[in-house]
Structure formats: structure tokens, C-alpha cells
Amino acid sequence: MKRSMYAGRVREEHIGTTITLKGWVSRRRDLGGLIFIDLRDREGVMQLVINPEEVSSDVMATAERLRSEYVIEVEGFVEARQQANDKLATGMVELKVSALTILNTAKTTPFEIKDDVEVSDDTRLRYRYLDLRRPEMLENFKLRAKVTHSIRNYLDDLEFIDVETPMLTKSTPEGARDYLVPSRVSQGHFYALPQSPQITKQLLMNAGFDRYYQIVKCFRDEDLRGDRQPEFTQVDLETSFLSEQEIQDIVEGMIAKVMKETKEIDVTLPLPRMSYDVAMNSYGSDKPDTRFEMLLQDLTVTVKGIDFKVFSEAPAVKAIVVKGNADRYSRKDIDKLTEFAKQFGAKGLAWVKVTDGQLAGPVAKFLTAIETELSSQLKLAENDLVLFVADTLEVANNTLGALRNRIAKDLDMIDQSQFNFLWVVDWPMFEWSEEEGRYMSAHHPFTLPTPESAHELEGDLAKVRAIAYDIVLNGYELGGGSLRINQKEMQERMFKALGFTADEANDQFGFLLEAMDYGFPPHGGLAIGLDRFVMLLAGKDNIREVIAFPKNNKASDPMTQAPSLVSENQLEELSLQIESHD
């Protein structure tokens, strides 16, 4: 029989009609001789009623065999439900079954197919096809489909061209580790799976495509966390002849359209803008969460003259004030915050509380001389908690920024219904890497430096600024972009500043440098993390919830057991040997 409609879409207007439904048995109940079945499909659940006095003995026998997750086909008459269920969209109606067929049986599932089920993440991933049956998960992927549909329509209307770029590319040394693919034909040579289509999309601008986009899979072999996966999807854009402001206007329009069509939220444009320096100094993060205050305060000058060398001799002393919540933090709680602070390089965490109008705590005695000035600068009030970090400016900012976010979550200070977008602009071109012992690109080596700072490529790299911009949502980097270098001489200077010899630059990027000999236009773009965007719209805290078949924190798939060993024959074809490192 042909399905008439989805079970979750049956409504009062269908009363009096005979329909055919197909789906899964969510629940079966036997009450007073009647059998009640909750039939589930992707659109929801509908109650079926099987009355032994109104169906054949075969139908009744089939109904008695039903168990959870059996796949069935039913035909019946839609009636008004005697006792409505306001919790279901179909709660005003039920189906009086006249015919019933079992299409497939099911073993007892390892967990219940329902929302808020308590089960380990690895079990969910091991049986992902069952996990995805849960209504909450289905809603996540309907939302994801709406977002991608909205984005495609918006960019198509602006005459962007959707172009697929290669999945097998050249490995480059900048950025995260590549996933490498050995070549069978060119033995000893490797492809890399793309971390992004950065260079190929720039070459499309050289080809005259003018406006490119792609919703594309990317790959990075990096340590995983809640908002990262080894393979992820990004909305990739590139344009020619536009300024950074024009590119940002396009992206803002796209964001506003998505928010209106998926959340019915009107986003006020233009979005707020914040410099990188303000973000780091006031929020302790280059992706500030602006849904709450608790800004970082610089006390370096204020504490210079006090008799406490930890403060007076530190390169920087900064603090955050936890307003009106000092009584929520015992010494044991603050010890836990101190251990947390050490993860970000801090040597410790100093603190005082405002109790009975006075400062109290381990360092209060050192602050007596400046108590009035300190209270005024920090706008202190009764029951405030002040947390200090004395260290380098970088460590102080990073530590207090992380503490700020943790405390806001602990104290439930964040309005989860808010969506605060902003641009972070005026980025440094380079970041110092302690691990590498050199400057690295803050974004990538194809970013255009500002005209005012480009001369420092041969001088102080810390002073070089980039024409770069990140879009931030609720403390997450949603995407990043920049204007790109289109002049060969500037690109060669950039590679040299990053420590490449001319031969190394030519070996890695010679094809790009050669392309710059053939009229490369001014261009720029941006990429937005689609998984992360949908995660935030869905109110989740892990992108696994919006990726159909994700990996776990070990970059493994418990369902397929990937990555897995391969046969000796496969290795021989690729001229590879596996060495044991016991």
C-alpha cells in the first residue's frame, strides 16, 4: 500500500478519512482488551487503536506480536481522540486500525529511542542509526537542512557560483596536521585532504569567477573537543574587487536571512565591531561572549607601589569581579578555580571578598593602602568576589578570560536565548609560537597586511597588522576571513617573514606564485563553520549533535571501527610498511 502521509502530520482535518501510515513502533500498550500503538516516523508520533471486536483475528494476532522498533504498515480510519494529549501535535486524533502488516522485526535496542535518554556517548555512536531516530536528533538535522537551504538561496540570488574544489590536494606546512593519502601511481608521494579550499578558491578568482561559494567538507588532524571534529563542513566564500566592508555586508545579510528563516529572529545590522586588542584586554578572548559583563580590569598601575612583590613587580595585574556572589565560593571552590587557572599558564590566583564593607581574604592586608582606589576602580559592593592574576599580559588575559566564561556558566549568568554576533577586526598578522620558537600566521600566509604596517615584514613582525576579520557568536568563532595577497612580490615577502627560503616557498607554493604573474585580481573572502553554526542555533554544546556520523574524542568511529587495519596486499600496492613502536 502507498503511504498516505507522515504519521506526525495527521490532524483534525483528516478525521473521517481512511489513510495508510508506515513507521516504527515507539510503544505498545494493552488496556482493557484494546491494543494501543504509538507509531513514530520522522515527523512525529500518532496513536493507533486496535480493537479485537473490529479487526480480523489475523490483524489481532499480528498486533500481539509487535515490539518496540518493529517496522509496520497500517491502514485505518482517523477519529477524534476521546482523551486529547496536548503534548503531541497529533494529540487530538487517533487511527482506528483495520489492516496491519509487519515490514520488519527488531531486536531489543541497547537504549530507549527517546529524548533525554541516559547512555554513554560511545554507545550512542556505536548505534548511531538508532540514536538518529530520536526526535531531538531528527529536529537537529531538519534545522541543518533549513540553514544550508537558506544559505544556498541567498548566495545564488547574489550570483555566487557554486564550484567544487579538489579533495585530493597538496600538503602544505602551515596550520594543523594534514590527513595524508598515499598515491599508488606515484609511489612515495602523498596527497593531503584539504584543511580548507583556500588556495583553490583564490585561483578561481584569478580565473575570473568573481564570486565563488561552496558548502564543503574539510579535514584537520588535530586534538578534538566539543566544537571540533576531524572532518567538518564550512560555508566557503571568495569574491573579487570587493573591500572588507563589502564582504562583511554580504556575510551579515546571509546571517540575518538564516536567523529569520530558522529562528524567526530579526538580527540588527550592521553587526557590532570590536578590535582584537579590545577583545583580548576586556574579555580575555579573541572570540568574546558579549551576553554578560564581568570585563577584565587592568590594575597594573594601581598596584605598582604596594608592598606585595607578586603584584608590584608583575608585568601585568588584571582582575575580574564576580558581582554579588562571593558567598557562593568557599576556599575549596576557589582552590578549584586556582587549579583551573594554572591550565592557562598562571602561577596562581589571588582573591579578596567584600565582607561588611571591607576587603577580606589572603591578599587583603597588602591592599590596605589602595583599598579606596581599588574599590572605586572596580566599583566594588558587598558580597563581591575579586579574582586577580599577576603575570605577563598574555597569561593574565587568557587566564581571566577562561575564568570569566567558566564562572558565568557555573552561576547561570548567561541568557541562553540570546544570539550575540559581532566582528573582531584589526588582527595581528602573526602570533608567536613557543612550541615552534617563531612567529606563525594568525590566520594563514595569504592574508593581506595593512598598508601602514607592511614595511614591518622585514622588521618587527609583532607590529604587522592584517586586513582580517572574524565573526563571533556567543563566545565561539563562527568564521574568519580576510583580504588576500594578490601581488607576487608581497606574497614572497610574506613567505620570507615566516621563515621560508625561496626554494621552500617555490616547492610548496610555486603554482600560486606563478599564477600571480597572470593578472591576479584583488580578492578576499571568508569561511563559516556550518557545524558550529547549527550547533549554536540548536542550543547544543557539541557539534557531534549536528553531524550525522561523527567521530569520538579519539577520532574514531565506534560504529564502523574506523580507522582500521588494512591488508598486507593493500600496503604492498602503496609501497608502505607499518613499523611497530613498542
UniProtKB/Swiss-Prot annotation:
One GO term (biological process): aspartyl-tRNA aminoacylation
Coiled-coil region(s): none
InterPro entries, sorted: Aa-tRNA-synt_II, aa-tRNA-synth_II, aa-tRNA-synth_II/BPL/LPL, Asp-tRNA-ligase_1, Asp-tRNA-ligase_1_N, Asp/Asn-tRNA-synth_IIb, AspRS_core, GAD-like_sf
Catalysis: reaction(s): tRNA(Asp) + L-aspartate + ATP = L-aspartyl-tRNA(Asp) + AMP + diphosphate
Function as written in the Swiss-Prot or TrEMBL entry: Catalyzes the attachment of L-aspartate to tRNA(Asp) in a two-step reaction: L-aspartate is first activated by ATP to form Asp-AMP and then transferred to the acceptor end of tRNA(Asp).
Assembly notes: Homodimer.
Protein name in the entry: Aspartate--tRNA ligase
Organism: Streptococcus pyogenes serotype M3 (strain ATCC BAA-595 / MGAS315)
